[in-house]
From Swiss-Prot:
This is Glycerol-1-phosphate dehydrogenase [NAD(P)+]. It is an enzyme of class 1 (oxidoreductase). One of its GO terms (cellular component) is cytoplasm. NCBIfam families: PRK00843.1 (NF002022). One of its GO terms (biological process) is glycerophospholipid metabolic process. It comes from Methanopyrus kandleri (strain AV19 / DSM 6324 / JCM 9639 / NBRC 100938). Pathway: Membrane lipid metabolism; glycerophospholipid metabolism. InterPro entries: G1P_dehydrogenase_arc, G1PDH, Glycerol_DH. Its EC number is 1.1.1.261. The gene is egsA. Belongs to the glycerol-1-phosphate dehydrogenase family. Binds 1 zinc ion per subunit. Its cofactor is Zn(2+). Substrate binds at residues 126, 173, 257. It comes from the Archaea.
Amino acid sequence: MSVPKKRMQLPREVVVGSNVLPEVPKLLRSVGVPDGVVAVFSGRTTMKIAGNEVADHLEEAGYQTSPVIVKGSTGDDVKKALEALDEIDADVVAAVGGGKVIDVAKVASYRRGIPFISVPTSASHDGIASPFASIRREGRPYSEPAQAPLAILADIEVIREAPERLIRAGVGDVVSNVTAVKDWRLAHRLRNEPYSEYASSLSLMAARIVMKNAKPIGKLLPEGIKKLVQALISGGVAMSIAGSSRPCSGSEHLFSHALDVIAERPALHGEQCGVGTIIMEYLHGGNWREIRETLETAGAPTTAEDLGVSDEEIIEALCRAHKIRPDRYTILGDKGLTREAAERAAEETGVIQ
């Protein structure tokens, strides 16, 4: 029996540590980019925090740089980024910022056939290393074809200075791997969906590392933040191995996306995924209390009140989550939850009162 061909994109170099921004030129040379024009993608705030410093280090090392300010992660933002790359004639992209900056950079660089390196300024989600990007079109997030970073440079001191809420959102995003893998296994068993034990094991290992280190992460200790960043990178690599977002995205992510559409003021993606994981682990018959305890220890939200959304919005999101991606089979099934089942799950887990 022949084996189908599979292509994986993985980062060639990963540097995680304190005060490592000066190593950007060395990192580029190590992955085969000794010179050329670097488009430095960043937000207005993150450009001041780290983008300008990255550009300075590159200029001192002989590279040419050109700043590209990314305001959001919509289709229009991608279009503007593509126009900027064409004007600059860039050889490589350095994405210095949070999730939106990195998502736009990985899509734009992919479409122009040039490499990009990821320089995260926060640890809020696993897009740091994944080959997928979430781009908003017509008010809704869509997964877009992109590429994994050629290299990653994560400065722990820069990430620690980000708003605490972003760190706690990262905890929620990693912990959600637990139910994502359970959903994937369920789809494999019931729908014969392709499944990778290697990718799922790596994803679960990342979740367990964060669960084990919830206390130092919650206290924003350097070693704790390092563990979180490594776990987020591992999740991204797991997705590259799987060739899909399955190892890190299941029913809890569908719940979060539904909440984005329904809620008047949605919370952060990772925060919502963490709360969604509590409920989905309950539906799977798993140890949802352990999930809740991990999030509480790390200072992450565990209730509707913590998220700043209403009980009704939680229930409505649970009822509509299965419609977000009908092709992605999860514990929610084809028909989703009844209102009664959604209300019971949210109440039993303490997400709503």
